[in-house]
């Protein structure tokens, strides 16, 4: 990802300083130490197993299927969930974690041999990736950070993982390594801030997805699937 350019920043800051009646401050500015930070107390002290219990209960409230499995059984669990959602076509990002978790054979050999179409996102194909996402019945991706409190998967978009994978297919499956589960948005924001503080680049698009697409009118009549997948499942890998 290339760095962007900031235009007219100095002029903008000088204008603000002028309106405040002082000269621009070029040094000595630090982040304040807040006296109260209650956001860190929510689910504080919870073990990873405790957080999984919170996540599982929340999935029941957000109409999301929750499955626990191990690395050794992941391929079978994924196969069963895709079948439960009606089979392919399937779209996935070009993510090395699929190989690390033993899913390459399923994606590249087994499903194609069964006439289940699998599209692996390829930035060189451009618009064809979006067309494949529109035609897909199931989108599958790994969660980068998982928020137990809200049942949210956090996904960092990149060239090999377009956001269309998460929003255009009829159904969606997130593979959730247990180690990615944190209490809430507070910890996810801290991870992103830490990357920035270290001089790293963060994705231009970070998606926070909480179950299937939900919409409601003023009378709170819930409609599922208007703006994205109609069904969603989280497959938690308990030994990763």
From Swiss-Prot:
Coiled-coil region(s): none
Q: Which Gene3D superfamilies match?
A: NagB/RpiA/CoA transferase-like
InterPro entries xref list: FTHF_cligase-like_sf (IPR024185), LUD_dom (IPR003741), LutC (IPR022823), NagB/RpiA_transferase-like (IPR037171)
One BP term from GO: lactate metabolic process
The job of this chain, per UniProt, is described as:
Is involved in L-lactate degradation and allows cells to grow with lactate as the sole carbon source.
HAMAP family tied to this protein: LutC
The protein's name:
Lactate utilization protein C
**Origin species:** Geobacillus kaustophilus (strain HTA426)
Query: What is this organism's lineage?
Result: Bacteria, Bacillati, Bacillota, Bacilli, Bacillales
């Amino acid at each position: 990802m290339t760095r962007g350019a900031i235009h007219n920043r100095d002029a903008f800051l000088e204008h603000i300083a002028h309106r405040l009646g002082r000269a621009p401050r070029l040094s000595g500015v630090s982040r304040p130490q807040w006296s109260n930070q209650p956001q860190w107390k929510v689910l504080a002290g919870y073990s990873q197993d405790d957080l999984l219990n919170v996540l599982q209960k929340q999935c029941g409230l957000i109409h999301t299927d929750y499955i626990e499995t191990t690395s050794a059984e992941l391929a079978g669990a994924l196969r069963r969930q895709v079948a439960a959602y009606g089979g392919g076509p399937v779209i996935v990002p070009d993510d090395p974690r699929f190989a690390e978790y033993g899913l390459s054979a399923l994606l590249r050999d087994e499903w194609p041999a069964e006439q289940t179409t699998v599209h692996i996102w390829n930035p060189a194909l451009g618009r064809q990736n979006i067309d494949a996402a529109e035609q897909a019945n199931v989108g599958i991706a790994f969660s980068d950070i998982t928020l137990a409190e809200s049942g949210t998967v956090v996904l960092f978009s990149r060239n090999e993982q377009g956001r269309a994978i998460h929003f255009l297919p009829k159904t969606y499956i997130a593979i959730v390594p247990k180690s990615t589960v944190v209490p809430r948005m507070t910890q996810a924001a801290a991870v992103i801030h830490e990357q920035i503080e270290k001089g790293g680049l963060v994705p231009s698009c970070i998606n926070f997805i909480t179950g299937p697409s939900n919409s409601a009118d003023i009378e709170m009549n819930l409609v599922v699937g208007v703006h994205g997948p109609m069904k969603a499942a989280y497959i938690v890998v308990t030994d990763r």
